[in-house]
């Protein structure tokens, strides 16, 4: 068949645009990133559009340039909304037929124009192929179909065409033309291959139909769009293809003895060829074809006139030639297969800017993959657990080893038992540890007893002094202050008693297992654990104990032959053969398990590497709302692995069924059952021995842990009781110092009272002498220096415990102590106000008391420390009377002075002429405590005190000795 020329669609032209600036502005505004980071990406897209404008019309390179730019536009559309409201870029394209410019801001218009040019390039590429060659013919056939597919994509996706060339009717006409030309190319190939006339007639009929459809479209809907030559060519080709169809159908009719019909068809073919002569370029082709038609027509007429004599129907009576479509539009998705898409389009230019929609869809697909993996993994784990449970129930393969070696297995020492003996080796007896614990406990109890005795002695002395001095002894009762200390002592005693109970339990455990400990320790040290194990087995009733040296115990039974040596009836399998069958099935099961694990591993790896991001990006709009169908399609690629896992599970079930039957038959053997009973008896004895020594070993570890805890407990208790002891000593020292000061004040008061009495007696004697004197009374008689008047002068100053106001020194007066003190009602600051010892806070069990700070004169006691009366400035006041809970100052007068009691007038009680005796000598007044240094002012607003023991209060060494000899508290010095 002579090749006819083909039509090709012209390309649309466009003006240059700038992608860079609008994209950078959008990246800055919408993505919040630095647009300078995307300079290269923006420049790449801009360069792709420039390259697309110069794409060749009839080359595959030009087609790929256009498709690369189009693919990047599809990817760009996922991230950047290019329209009039967002990224505003004016795209100007010229109509391919009328050459009129059209401008729009829509990216869809840009993509439609690119696809139109791809179709045009494909049609040009197909029309320029040399169809005389096999490769050229195939390329032309494929390119015409691909061009039709691109036009179809435009017709289906771009409904509102802004230009004439993109109009639906124009595009539909182009589709018919490209498909008709693809059909014609296929017909040429079949004519060359000399296919049957009927088949060729159908192909030509389809081509004629497509050309006629295109001709109608040009005449009805696209007038003024296509060039006039397109109309002539399409009409001429429609008539020519109809002539070819009639010609080959006539040949087919002649072969089927329809000679009259064949003649009529040849006449029709000749008529169509004459009509097709309208286009000059087809004249030669049509003339050649018409000559063939006329030759055949003359031959058929002659044969029919002389031979067949069949009537020749008219043209209207001929049936239409059947049509056979051989060309179809290739969709865009099939234009490039496999890796060609990635190779032509290249990587996503803006892949660093991931759209949220694609990410969400990909995450949904990942979840579907995860569900698949979880389901298959669960099935594999279930199958493995079922196999393990079944084998464990059958006691396989362990029981096979027993059967293969005979039931009389060597009862060697257990490795765990040997390890226990080795751990006990080298450990000393616990007796010494228990002795140490008892010693520590005794030491703690002794300390607690001493503390109690010291508190009892202090309390006894305090109450004796109160009994002696009555209301003058106003020191706080000890029972109120030492209650916390006594409570701590009781708590510690209770804690020690509880610990003693625990010690007794530990000791009982030690006594119970002492012999066993010694045996295991000796066995571990001499490496004779197997000997000890043998004795235990013999004691448990075993007759099969056997040591490492291979010497059987004296109670071992006579050795019998192995079960593998026994052969039964010829018609039955021996024990060895049955064991071999069981082992064979076990090997198959293990092989199935390994294969299943490997298939699951391969499936996980394949799922992990599966990525459909490109599919999601390229088909973003087409799969909208149909993600589940896409996921199902993509997951089908894992179906082979799932089938292999399913087959493995079925195979395992069949093997387990066979194993159960074979192994059950083996166990029903009489000899096997008899020997198995013996072995089970030995196993029970062995378990009994191991359970006994496990209990001993646990008791040993329990003793180690218990003694370690007891040692830690007693160590902490020693520290705690030592702290308690220091607190008790501090408390007693403070009480002693306070009592000593109180005793000194009482003695000084008594001495002051005696001095006042002496002065009053002297004054009365002087007045009596004046009355008895006959000399005239002088106006002013000074008293002798040896008898100073006490009416106007105060007694010798004594440092009184008065409460001076702020910044005012207290005058040195002898205090007057009232039996009832009510200073609590006035809130007067205290010169010394020790709180009851109840302020001591007992620490929790195991926690040491705060270390008592030794008293140091000249340093104020911090408020955070415990009770310490010695840390406050001297002189300190005495404790309040028993009726008071806390210390308080004396009542009014508030000036700090105490009014001495008025002396009694002896003249009212003595007879006339009574001469009083001379006054007794003034007693030496002791001072407590001895002055050893200055006393600082303490916290709480105490006034600064002068150093105690200065001026008239300074004592000589002899006086100090005399004072200490009469001090009832001096005996408490030995407490410390």
Curated annotation (Swiss-Prot):
Gene3D superfamilies: alix/aip1 in complex with the ypdl late domain (1.20.120.560), alix/aip1 like domains (1.25.40.280). One of its GO terms (cellular component) is endosome. Disulfide bonds: none annotated. Residues 775-792, 851-862, 884-895 have a biased composition (Low complexity). Keywords: Coiled coil, Cytoplasm, Endosome, Protein transport, Transport. Residues 746-762 have a biased composition (Basic and acidic residues). Its main location: cytoplasm. Residues 5-387 form the BRO1 domain. InterPro entries: ALIX_V_dom, BRO1_dom, BRO1_sf. It is found in: Cytoplasm; Endosome. Residues 748-775 form a coiled coil. Residues 914-937 have a biased composition (Pro residues). GO terms for biological process: protein transport to vacuole involved in ubiquitin-dependent protein catabolic process via the multivesicular body sorting pathway. Residues 743-762, 769-976 are annotated as: Disordered. Belongs to the BRO1 family. Involved in concentration and sorting of cargo proteins of the multivesicular body (MVB) for incorporation into intralumenal vesicles. This is Vacuolar protein-sorting protein bro1. The lineage of its organism: Eukaryota, Fungi, Dikarya, Ascomycota, Pezizomycotina.
């Amino acid at each position: 068949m002579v090749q006819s020329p083909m039509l090709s669609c012209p390309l649309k032209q466009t003006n240059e645009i700038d992608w860079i600036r609008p994209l950078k502005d959008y990246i800055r505004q919408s993505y919040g990133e630095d647009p300078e980071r995307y300079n290269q990406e923006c420049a790449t897209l801009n360069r792709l559009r420039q390259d697309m404008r110069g794409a060749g019309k009839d080359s595959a390179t030009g087609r790929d340039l256009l498709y690369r730019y189009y693919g990047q536009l599809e990817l760009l559309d996922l991230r950047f909304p290019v329209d009039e409201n967002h990224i505003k870029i004016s795209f100007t394209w010229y109509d391919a037929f009328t050459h009129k410019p059209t401008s729009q801001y829509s990216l869809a218009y840009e993509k439609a124009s690119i696809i139109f040019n791809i179709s045009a390039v494909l049609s040009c590429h197909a029309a320029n192929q040399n169809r005389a060659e096999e490769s050229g013919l195939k390329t032309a056939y494929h390119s015409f179909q691909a061009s039709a597919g691109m036009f179809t994509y435009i017709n289906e996706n771009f409904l509102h065409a802004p230009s004439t060339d993109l109009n639906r009717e124009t595009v539909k006409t182009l589709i018919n033309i490209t498909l008709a030309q693809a059909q014609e190319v296929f017909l040429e190939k079949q004519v060359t291959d000399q296919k049957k006339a009927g088949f060729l007639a159908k192909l030509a009929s389809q081509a004629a139909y497509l050309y006629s459809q295109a001709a109608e479209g040009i005449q009805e809907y696209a007038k003024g769009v296509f060039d006039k030559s397109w109309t002539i060519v399409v009409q001429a080709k429609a008539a020519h293809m109809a002539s070819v169809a009639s010609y080959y159908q006539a040949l087919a009719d002649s072969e089927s003895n329809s000679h009259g019909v064949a003649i009529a068809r040849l006449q029709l073919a000749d008529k169509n060829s004459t009509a097709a002569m309208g286009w000059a370029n087809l004249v030669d082709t049509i003339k050649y074809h018409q000559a063939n038609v006329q030759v055949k027509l003359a031959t058929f007429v002659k044969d029919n006139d002389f031979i067949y004599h069949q009537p020749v129907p008219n043209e209207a009576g001929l049936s239409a030639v059947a049509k056979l479509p051989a060309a179809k539009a290739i969709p865009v998705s099939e234009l490039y297969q496999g890796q060609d898409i990635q190779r032509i389009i290249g990587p996503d230019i803006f892949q660093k800017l991931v759209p949220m929609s694609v990410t969400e869809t990909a995450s949904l697909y990942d979840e579907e993959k995860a569900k698949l993996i979880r389901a298959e993994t669960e099935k594999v784990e279930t199958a493995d657990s079922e196999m393990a449970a079944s084998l464990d129930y059958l006691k396989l393969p362990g029981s096979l080893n027993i059967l293969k070696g005979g039931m009389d297995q060597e009862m060697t020492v257990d490795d765990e038992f040997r390890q226990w003996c080795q751990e006990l080796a080298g450990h000393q007896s616990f007796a010494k540890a228990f002795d140490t614990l008892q010693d520590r406990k005794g030491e703690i109890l002794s300390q607690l007893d001493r503390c109690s005795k010291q508190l009892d002695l202090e309390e006894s002395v305090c109450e004796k002094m109160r009994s002696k001095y009555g209301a003058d002894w106003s020191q706080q009762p000890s029972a109120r202050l030492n209650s916390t200390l006594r409570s701590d002592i009781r708590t510690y005693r209770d804690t020690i008693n509880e610990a003693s109970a625990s010690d007794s339990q530990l000791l009982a455990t030690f006594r119970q297992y002492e012999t066993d400990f010694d045996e295991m320790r000796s066995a571990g040290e001499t490496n004779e654990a197997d000997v000890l194990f043998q004795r235990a087995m013999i004691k448990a009733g075993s007759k099969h104990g056997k040591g490492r040296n291979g010497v059987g115990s004296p109670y071992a039974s006579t050795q019998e032959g192995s079960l593998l040596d026994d052969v039964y009836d010829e018609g039955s399998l021996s024990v060895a053969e049955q064991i071999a069958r069981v082992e064979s099935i076990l090997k198959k099961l293990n092989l199935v398990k390994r294969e299943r694990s490997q298939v699951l591993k391969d499936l996980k790896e394949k799922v992990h590497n599966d990525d459909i991001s490109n599919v999601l990006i390229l088909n973003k709009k087409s799969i909208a709302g149909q993600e589940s169908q896409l996921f199902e399609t993509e997951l089908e690629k894992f179906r082979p692995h799932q089938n292999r896992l399913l087959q493995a599970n079925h195979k395992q079930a069949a093997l387990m069924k066979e194993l159960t039957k074979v192994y059950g038959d083996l166990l029903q053997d009489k000899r096997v059952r008899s020997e198995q009973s013996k072995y089970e008896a030995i196993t029970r004895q062995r378990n009994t021995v191991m359970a006994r020594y496990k209990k001993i070993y646990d008791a040993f570890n329990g003793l180690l842990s218990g003694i370690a805890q007891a040692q830690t407990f007693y160590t902490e208790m020693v520290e705690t009781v030592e702290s308690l002891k220091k607190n008790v000593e501090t408390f007693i020292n403070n009480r002693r110092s306070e009592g000593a000061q109180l005793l000194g004040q009482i003695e000084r008061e008594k001495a002051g009272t005696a001095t006042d009495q002496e002065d009053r007696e002297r004054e009365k004697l002087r007045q009596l002498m004046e009355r008895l004197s006959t000399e005239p009374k002088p106006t002013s008689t000074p008293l002798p220096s040896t008898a100073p008047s006490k009416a106007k002068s105060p007694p010798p100053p004594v440092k009184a415990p008065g409460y001076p106001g702020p910044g005012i020194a207290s005058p040195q007066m002898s205090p007057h102590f009232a039996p009832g003190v009510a200073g609590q009602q006035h809130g007067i600051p205290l010169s010394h106000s020790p709180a009851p010892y109840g302020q001591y806070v007992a620490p929790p069990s195991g926690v040491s008391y705060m270390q008592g700070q030794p008293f140091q004169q000249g340093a104020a006691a911090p408020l955070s420390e415990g009770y310490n009366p010695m840390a406050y400035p001297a002189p300190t006041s005495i404790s309040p009377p028993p009726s008071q809970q806390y210390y308080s100052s004396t009542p009014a007068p508030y000036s700090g002075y105490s009014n001495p009691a008025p002396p009694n007038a002896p003249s009212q009680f003595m007879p006339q002429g009574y001469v009083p005796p001379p006054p007794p000598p003034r007693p030496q007044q002791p001072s407590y405590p001895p002055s050893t240094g200055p006393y600082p002012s303490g916290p709480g607003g105490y006034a600064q005190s002068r150093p105690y023991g200065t001026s008239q209060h300074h004592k000589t060494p002899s006086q100090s000795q005399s004072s200490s000899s009469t001090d009832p508290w001096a005996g408490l010095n030995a407490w410390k």
